[in-house]
């Protein structure tokens, strides 16, 4: 992963920034989609990419599809929070969009890997990192097989990568073990709700009230 160097932002935006991290097969996307469907006060950050759209993909839904020249220009202007080159294509997270949303009081969620999460923390020190774990390695392997998306050799590589990825769970703020989906979803919702009640979040959202009450 790469980044444009920035100073960490400690500004208390009315909106919160959440990062959900997990190895492939842990159920991250399914949990995130369920959360977004039930909580309209949080928005998913859509990445920018230079790769071509796949069948069924729509610009602005799965990705923001842009040209290499557009990508490089935005990167050089410091508009990306973090970016990476994968298999000859560029991918990035928009810093500008995230700051705009949070300034308006909207919570933002990133589906991201642990390396990207480290870069985000350099820019947003108050970002909340949530790590999703499988109940066991056996369960993780079974889920990868049931998806039917990968060849056996790819599954082996994903399992090997998962071990390295999960070693970074200790860097997160919260850990959710996704054994029973409904329980995991409830726990994810609880993290979001609790974060909104933090002193810094409440002060940013209710600045005038806090001033009136003499709370600093």
Curated annotation (Swiss-Prot):
InterPro entries: GK/Ca_channel_bsu, Guanylate_kin-like_dom, Guanylate_kinase, Guanylate_kinase_CS, P-loop_NTPase. CDD domains: GMPK (cd00071). It is found in: Cytoplasm. Its EC number is 2.7.4.8. GO terms for molecular function: ATP binding; guanylate kinase activity. ATP binds at residues 22-29. Residues 15-193 form the Guanylate kinase-like domain. This is Guanylate kinase. It comes from Cupriavidus metallidurans (strain ATCC 43123 / DSM 2839 / NBRC 102507 / CH34) (Ralstonia metallidurans).
């Amino acid at each position: 992963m790469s980044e444009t160097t920035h100073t960490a932002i400690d500004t208390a935006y009315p909106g919160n920034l959440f990062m959900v991290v997990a190895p492939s097969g842990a159920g991250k996307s399914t949990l995130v989609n369920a959360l977004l469907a039930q909580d309209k006060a949080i928005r998913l950050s859509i990445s920018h990419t230079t790769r071509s759209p796949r069948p069924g993909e729509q610009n602005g839904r799965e990705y923001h599809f842009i040209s290499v020249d557009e990508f490089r220009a935005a990167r050089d202007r410091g508009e990306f929070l973090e970016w990476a080159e994968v298999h000859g294509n560029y991918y990035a997270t928009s810093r500008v969009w995230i700051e705009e949303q949070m300034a308006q009081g909207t919570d933002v969620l990133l589906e991201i890997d642990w390396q990207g999460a480290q870069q985000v923390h350099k820019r947003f020190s108050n970002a909340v990192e949530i790590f999703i774990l499988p109940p066991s390695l056996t369960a993780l392997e079974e889920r990868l097989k049931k998806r039917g998306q990968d060849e056996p050799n790819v599954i082996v590589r994903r399992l090997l990568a998962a071990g390295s990825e999960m070693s970074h769970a200790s860097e997160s703020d919260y850990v959710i073990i996704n054994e029973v989906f409904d329980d995991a979803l409830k726990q994810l919702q609880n993290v979001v709700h609790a974060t909104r009640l933090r002193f810094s979040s409440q002060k940013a959202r209710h600045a005038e009230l806090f001033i009136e009450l003499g709370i600093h």
